[in-house]
Swiss-Prot record:
GO terms for molecular function: ribosomal large subunit binding. Belongs to the RRF family. One of its GO terms (cellular component) is cytosol. Pfam families: RRF. The gene is frr. It comes from Xanthomonas oryzae pv. oryzae (strain KACC10331 / KXO85). This is Ribosome-recycling factor.
Length: 185
Protein backbone atom coordinates (compact mmCIF):
# COMPACT_ATOMS: atom_id res chain seq x y z
CA UNK A 1 0.00 0.00 0.00
CA UNK A 2 2.80 2.43 0.90
CA UNK A 3 4.63 1.53 -2.31
CA UNK A 4 1.50 2.40 -4.28
CA UNK A 5 1.22 5.78 -2.54
CA UNK A 6 4.89 6.57 -3.27
CA UNK A 7 4.58 5.48 -6.92
CA UNK A 8 1.43 7.57 -7.36
CA UNK A 9 3.14 10.62 -5.85
CA UNK A 10 6.19 10.14 -8.08
CA UNK A 11 4.02 9.78 -11.20
CA UNK A 12 2.04 12.91 -10.37
CA UNK A 13 5.22 14.91 -9.65
CA UNK A 14 6.73 13.79 -12.97
CA UNK A 15 3.55 14.85 -14.77
CA UNK A 16 3.75 18.25 -13.09
CA UNK A 17 7.34 18.72 -14.31
CA UNK A 18 6.39 17.57 -17.82
CA UNK A 19 3.51 20.06 -17.84
CA UNK A 20 5.96 22.82 -16.87
CA UNK A 21 8.34 21.82 -19.67
CA UNK A 22 5.48 21.86 -22.18
CA UNK A 23 4.22 25.19 -20.89
CA UNK A 24 7.68 26.74 -21.22
CA UNK A 25 7.95 25.71 -24.89
CA UNK A 26 5.38 28.40 -25.67
CA UNK A 27 7.57 31.13 -24.15
CA UNK A 28 9.28 33.05 -26.92
CA UNK A 29 13.08 33.02 -26.70
CA UNK A 30 14.08 34.74 -29.92
CA UNK A 31 14.29 31.49 -31.87
CA UNK A 32 11.37 30.50 -34.05
CA UNK A 33 9.44 27.45 -32.89
CA UNK A 34 5.99 26.23 -33.97
CA UNK A 35 5.24 25.66 -30.26
CA UNK A 36 5.11 29.47 -29.84
CA UNK A 37 1.72 29.43 -31.52
CA UNK A 38 0.26 26.54 -29.47
CA UNK A 39 -1.93 28.82 -27.37
CA UNK A 40 -3.50 30.66 -30.30
CA UNK A 41 -7.13 29.84 -31.02
CA UNK A 42 -8.77 30.78 -34.33
CA UNK A 43 -12.47 31.39 -34.87
CA UNK A 44 -13.11 28.58 -37.36
CA UNK A 45 -16.45 27.14 -38.38
CA UNK A 46 -18.17 28.73 -35.41
CA UNK A 47 -15.82 27.48 -32.69
CA UNK A 48 -12.42 28.39 -31.30
CA UNK A 49 -9.96 25.96 -32.85
CA UNK A 50 -6.22 25.66 -32.10
CA UNK A 51 -4.16 27.19 -34.91
CA UNK A 52 -2.21 23.97 -35.47
CA UNK A 53 -5.48 22.22 -36.42
CA UNK A 54 -6.32 24.65 -39.23
CA UNK A 55 -2.80 25.19 -40.58
CA UNK A 56 0.65 23.69 -40.81
CA UNK A 57 3.34 25.74 -39.10
CA UNK A 58 7.00 25.53 -40.10
CA UNK A 59 10.22 27.36 -39.29
CA UNK A 60 11.86 29.32 -42.07
CA UNK A 61 15.32 30.91 -41.84
CA UNK A 62 15.58 30.44 -38.07
CA UNK A 63 13.80 33.66 -37.10
CA UNK A 64 10.50 33.36 -38.94
CA UNK A 65 7.50 31.06 -38.99
CA UNK A 66 5.45 30.18 -42.05
CA UNK A 67 1.77 29.34 -41.56
CA UNK A 68 0.17 27.44 -44.44
CA UNK A 69 -3.59 27.31 -44.00
CA UNK A 70 -5.63 24.27 -44.97
CA UNK A 71 -8.58 26.55 -45.80
CA UNK A 72 -7.42 29.68 -47.63
CA UNK A 73 -10.59 31.56 -46.65
CA UNK A 74 -9.43 31.74 -43.03
CA UNK A 75 -6.47 34.06 -43.59
CA UNK A 76 -8.21 37.08 -42.01
CA UNK A 77 -9.34 35.03 -38.97
CA UNK A 78 -5.83 33.67 -38.38
CA UNK A 79 -4.34 37.14 -38.81
CA UNK A 80 -6.81 38.51 -36.23
CA UNK A 81 -6.00 35.70 -33.77
CA UNK A 82 -2.26 36.39 -34.04
CA UNK A 83 -2.78 40.11 -33.44
CA UNK A 84 -5.00 39.30 -30.44
CA UNK A 85 -2.36 37.03 -28.86
CA UNK A 86 0.12 38.62 -26.48
CA UNK A 87 3.13 37.42 -28.47
CA UNK A 88 3.77 40.83 -29.98
CA UNK A 89 4.13 39.43 -33.50
CA UNK A 90 2.98 41.07 -36.72
CA UNK A 91 1.71 38.68 -39.40
CA UNK A 92 2.56 39.35 -43.04
CA UNK A 93 0.21 37.80 -45.59
CA UNK A 94 2.06 36.63 -48.70
CA UNK A 95 -0.43 35.11 -51.13
CA UNK A 96 -1.93 32.11 -49.37
CA UNK A 97 0.58 31.87 -46.51
CA UNK A 98 1.21 33.98 -43.43
CA UNK A 99 4.77 34.85 -42.39
CA UNK A 100 5.72 35.78 -38.86
CA UNK A 101 9.12 37.41 -38.44
CA UNK A 102 10.38 37.22 -34.88
CA UNK A 103 12.25 40.39 -33.99
CA UNK A 104 15.03 40.09 -31.42
CA UNK A 105 13.73 40.40 -27.87
CA UNK A 106 14.40 43.64 -26.02
CA UNK A 107 16.12 43.48 -22.63
CA UNK A 108 12.90 44.64 -20.96
CA UNK A 109 10.85 41.92 -22.67
CA UNK A 110 13.46 39.29 -21.72
CA UNK A 111 13.21 40.27 -18.06
CA UNK A 112 9.41 40.23 -18.25
CA UNK A 113 9.44 36.74 -19.79
CA UNK A 114 12.00 35.60 -17.22
CA UNK A 115 9.64 36.68 -14.41
CA UNK A 116 6.83 34.79 -16.11
CA UNK A 117 8.99 31.65 -16.37
CA UNK A 118 9.95 32.00 -12.70
CA UNK A 119 6.25 32.32 -11.77
CA UNK A 120 5.35 29.17 -13.69
CA UNK A 121 8.18 27.38 -11.89
CA UNK A 122 6.77 28.50 -8.54
CA UNK A 123 3.31 27.24 -9.55
CA UNK A 124 4.84 23.85 -10.34
CA UNK A 125 6.57 23.76 -6.96
CA UNK A 126 3.25 24.49 -5.24
CA UNK A 127 1.63 21.65 -7.20
CA UNK A 128 4.45 19.29 -6.17
CA UNK A 129 4.11 20.28 -2.52
CA UNK A 130 0.36 19.66 -2.72
CA UNK A 131 1.08 16.18 -4.10
CA UNK A 132 3.43 15.60 -1.14
CA UNK A 133 0.74 16.77 1.28
CA UNK A 134 -1.83 14.41 -0.28
CA UNK A 135 0.58 11.45 -0.14
CA UNK A 136 1.52 12.17 3.48
CA UNK A 137 -2.17 12.41 4.36
CA UNK A 138 -2.78 8.98 2.81
CA UNK A 139 0.09 7.58 4.89
CA UNK A 140 -1.35 9.17 8.05
CA UNK A 141 -4.75 7.67 7.25
CA UNK A 142 -3.17 4.22 6.96
CA UNK A 143 -1.38 4.77 10.27
CA UNK A 144 -4.63 5.87 11.91
CA UNK A 145 -6.36 2.74 10.59
CA UNK A 146 -3.46 0.70 12.01
CA UNK A 147 -2.68 -0.65 8.50
CA UNK A 148 1.00 0.31 8.91
CA UNK A 149 3.37 0.77 11.84
CA UNK A 150 4.76 4.14 12.90
CA UNK A 151 8.21 3.20 11.60
CA UNK A 152 6.81 2.24 8.19
CA UNK A 153 4.82 5.47 8.04
CA UNK A 154 7.85 7.58 9.01
CA UNK A 155 9.96 5.79 6.39
CA UNK A 156 7.31 6.37 3.73
CA UNK A 157 7.08 10.06 4.64
CA UNK A 158 10.88 10.34 4.37
CA UNK A 159 10.77 8.69 0.93
CA UNK A 160 7.99 11.05 -0.17
CA UNK A 161 10.08 14.01 1.05
CA UNK A 162 13.05 12.75 -1.00
CA UNK A 163 10.81 12.51 -4.08
CA UNK A 164 9.59 16.04 -3.42
CA UNK A 165 13.12 17.40 -3.02
CA UNK A 166 14.19 15.77 -6.29
CA UNK A 167 11.12 17.07 -8.15
CA UNK A 168 11.66 20.62 -6.88
CA UNK A 169 15.32 20.41 -7.88
CA UNK A 170 14.21 19.32 -11.37
CA UNK A 171 11.79 22.27 -11.57
CA UNK A 172 14.61 24.64 -10.57
CA UNK A 173 16.85 23.18 -13.29
CA UNK A 174 14.14 23.50 -15.97
CA UNK A 175 13.41 27.11 -14.96
CA UNK A 176 17.11 28.01 -14.78
CA UNK A 177 17.74 26.54 -18.25
CA UNK A 178 14.81 28.47 -19.73
CA UNK A 179 15.90 31.71 -18.07
CA UNK A 180 19.43 31.25 -19.45
CA UNK A 181 17.95 30.60 -22.89
CA UNK A 182 15.93 33.81 -22.57
CA UNK A 183 18.86 35.93 -21.47
CA UNK A 184 21.17 34.66 -24.22
CA UNK A 185 21.18 37.27 -26.96
Amino acid sequence: MLTQIKQDAQTRMTKSIDALRHSLTTVRTGRASPALLDGIKVKAYGTDTPLNQVASISVSEGRSLVISLFDKGMIKDVEKAIYASDLGLTPTVVGTVIRLNLPPLTEERRKELSKSVHGEGEDSKVAIRNIRRDANQQVKDLLKDKAVTEDEARGAEDDIQKLTDKAIKDVDEVVKAKEQELMTV
